[in-house]
Amino acid sequence: MDVSVDTDYLNTLIRNPVINSEAAHFLYDERKIDPRIVRWCGISSISQPTPCWRWGKAFYDAPSLLIPYRDVDGKLLSVQGRYMGKEDKPRFRFPRGSQVGMYNKPVIRRLKPGDELWIAEGPSDCWGLLSAGLKAVAIPSATSLTKADISLLREGLPEGVSLHMYPDNDEPGMKLFEDLKRWFPQLKGHVLPEGCKDFGEFYKLGIKRE
């Protein structure tokens, strides 16, 4: 049975973003994310378990970040929950039926000829790249890309836009880079400093990029 994401309800859920104390600690204290990026991405948070559709029971655990996924024109596709509590619960949750693909697609419309577009493994690393002044999207796995995403990155970018990535310093990170390299041969890999497991850690330590 096909299940449609209740984007009308989800829009009301994130219309007026709230950053609770747990979210503020995670975003600003731990990750050092620029508040302007939090606003640009429309990140919100919840302190009580919350449904993902108007007549449903609680779906998103609390406390959680609410992370909107949008298409290139800003239309809401779904909202991912990112659990920040200490109980043994799933860290990431999407409403059933979500088909979101790449994260932060609206940044594509801000690219100019000759720009760099950076690829992160997940939203939090994407926020770090954005906070560092880079234009970035996130692709958690090569299999999460939609056909439209692949077409967009291959043929829909302004002239001269180059693709870049700091692969995570682990086996899954290198595998993702290699998988994406098959789709996008022009993708350029960059090496993180020794001891940094991902770009988010690199960014919050304040290390300057070479």
Question: What feature does the model see in each segment?
Answer:
Residues I119, G160-P172:
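Acidic beta-strand-to-loop metal/phosphate-binding motif
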Residues R54-G56, S151-E155, D198-E210:
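Short, surface-exposed amphipathic charged segments that create phosphate/polyanion-binding patches used
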Residues A142-T146, P167-F177:
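Acidic, metal-coordinating catalytic cores used for nucleic-acid/nucleotide bond scission
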Residues L153, K175-P185:
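Short, aromatic/basic amphipathic alpha-helical patches
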Residues M1-L66, R70-D73, I108-P113:
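TOPRIM metal-binding catalytic domain and adjacent DNA-binding surface shared by DnaG-type primases
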